[in-house]
């Protein structure tokens, strides 16, 4: 693969002159890197400086308000630990957002490409840069709201940078607390799920989950339905490693300090930078070998894919003659970066399997559309609903609603998805908010068995209530959007 020329000068911001030209006059687009929030991401070269950049191309029918918010947040940031923003263009029906290029891809990409989880030294080094990025954002009164391995990018030197601000938010004096569910369910803080308002330390919980993800290859609860996960995260004790004995006391304590359920008692980014696990982190040079290995694997797979495409073109005539016996499997055979759904018990080795995790496949950002069978990146958005910014797991609520309606059509006696009285569970059966379960010791065996038997229907009822609350909030927005579209069509 031909290497880009060395940069003539470091690009800091696009000049006014550059911004008045067509983007093709300013950049040479080289290749597609993957899918980001709202659009496709491409690798390109800035002709004047020779610098490699990333360009996100966003269709204008996407939610422009959300895109403008993302650009606004990026534009205000000037930190070596946050992906830089250079400028934007409108080209035909697309908005081009020019950003800093991180050649090694996301931490999630690297884990999948190498089929290996990370060791403690690598995790500590990545976390140190990530915490510096969070410290900067939080000082600027910004919440990222979607911290995970898929949104931590590495450049070829090993410097980690925060990316994908599609759901980030600005804290203001008039809106110091948020009460909307935004993010990806497995990484979400309990207070975010409970919609009781949250602030910057919600990112710290997500960082703790990301630490486990880097160590074990997936976040806690990844093997269960996301709807169940959002019930379990606020009610269960904070998650920890599946095999705590494999990890040092410092690392275990760091994760424990991130995963404190009470946000008022949770450590801040500044405090965590003083934690022994982070203070003893090694320099970024220790990441170079794993980055080189991942990039070599990626290049090899790209070459294999190109070779297979060429072979398919050569054999296309034969395929047409014998179309009933030919089955194309190019995507499957190339083995592009797929999210893994299960982990082997072997030390630090991740094995790829077919999806056993419904449709989430740990997809970072949003679940794929139904017609996509393979995931080729770590930053996917649902192609069927680009207009509305909403958490990924809410797709399951829509499916549950559809399923309930199907039951109504099949059986007129099944009108309620959960046929139970609201008062079937006494108030004292509710899970304590402080997570103190000592009271269970005083219950009889029969009471414990009854409580255990009641948990599933209780959970299903609470999930249904959450779905109904979300639908009640979402429908007026959709109605207003439809009304605006109809008015625009009348012009």
UniProtKB/Swiss-Prot annotation:
User: Where is it made, tissue-wise?
Assistant: Expressed at high levels in adult kidney, skeletal and placenta tissues and at very low levels in adult heart, lung and brain tissues.
So which domain of life are we looking at? Eukaryota
Q: Where is the Protein kinase domain?
A: 27-278
Region Disordered, annotated ranges: 301-327, 370-392
Chief site of localization: cytoplasm
Q: What class of enzyme is it?
A: transferase
Q: Which GO terms describe its cellular component?
A: centrosome; cytoplasm; cytosol; nucleus; protein-containing complex
- Would the keyword Acetylation turn up in this protein's UniProt record? yes
* Record's note on what induces expression: Activity increases during mitosis.
Any idea which residues bear Phosphothreonine here? 117, 174, 180, 336, 378, 384
Subcellular locations according to the entry:
Cytoplasm; Nucleus; Cytoplasm, Cytoskeleton, Microtubule organizing center, Centrosome
**What are the UniProt keywords, alphabetically?**
Acetylation, Apoptosis, ATP-binding, Coiled coil, Cytoplasm, Cytoskeleton, Kinase, Magnesium, Metal-binding, Nucleotide-binding, Nucleus, Phosphoprotein, Serine/threonine-protein kinase, Transferase, Ubl conjugation
Location of the active site? 146
Which residues in this protein are found as N-acetylmethionine? 1
> What EC number(s) does its UniProt record assign?
2.7.11.1
Which residues bind ATP per the record? Answer: 33-41, 56
Q: How does it assemble?
A: Homodimer; mediated via the coiled-coil region. Interacts with NORE1, which inhibits autoactivation. Interacts with and stabilizes SAV1. Interacts with RAF1, which prevents dimerization and phosphorylation. Interacts with RASSF1. Interacts (via SARAH domain) with isoform 1 of NEK2. Interacts with ESR1 only in the presence of SAV1. Interacts with PKB/AKT1. Forms a tripartite complex with MOBKL1B and STK38. Interacts with RASSF2 (via SARAH domain). Interacts with DLG5 (via PDZ domain 3). Interacts with LATS1; this interaction is inhibited in the presence of DLG5.
Q: What is this protein called?
A: Serine/threonine-protein kinase 3
Q: What's the name of its gene?
A: STK3
